[in-house]
Amino acid sequence: MREENKTYITHLKVTDVPWHRLTTAYGRGTEFPAHLAVLEQMGDLASVKESLYELTANMEHQSTLWHATPFGMVFLSRILEKALKESGKNPVAYFLAGELLDFFACILQCFHDGDEMEHAEPLPLFSDLLKEGNLWSEEYDEEEDEMRYEEDEAFPDDLFYSFYYFSWQACLLYTSPSPRD
């Protein structure tokens, strides 16, 4: 992994991401920060289940990953680390860790399947996903978004493959031994 990408992933904050301009399976990632906060707290099981469902359903649908997915994976990776550390004393953390491990397996399978096919090269930098030309409109308009999807190239090939590649990279960084511990 390129050093710039490691640094970017490691230092990325939820507030650095324009979630409202990133596509998901069912719209935009506007609500991601609130759902990530619920998971981070690992408090109420019902709330954790609801937020986990909202995130995972919007990050992956029928093996398709979306613009918000790599960014979601950065934060879910951090949450998984925390959940694993707390799983011995917090039943919600234990539940969440198991569910996240299953979801990560799904994301990694999506990457593997896509990587087996002919594909474009990924964007050079994770941060390139947030370049102005790669973001969707500032204001969400469901009809406008649907029309863009109906076009042949809703996403350029390199951008689309980058959804998969950088989702994998986010997982990879957090599965490697690190000096953070």
Question: Which functions belong to the PLM regions below?
Answer:
Residues 2-45:
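N-terminal "cap/leader" segments of large eukaryotic alpha-helical scaffolds
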Residues 57, 61, 78, 82, ...:
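Positions within ordered alpha-helical repeat solenoids
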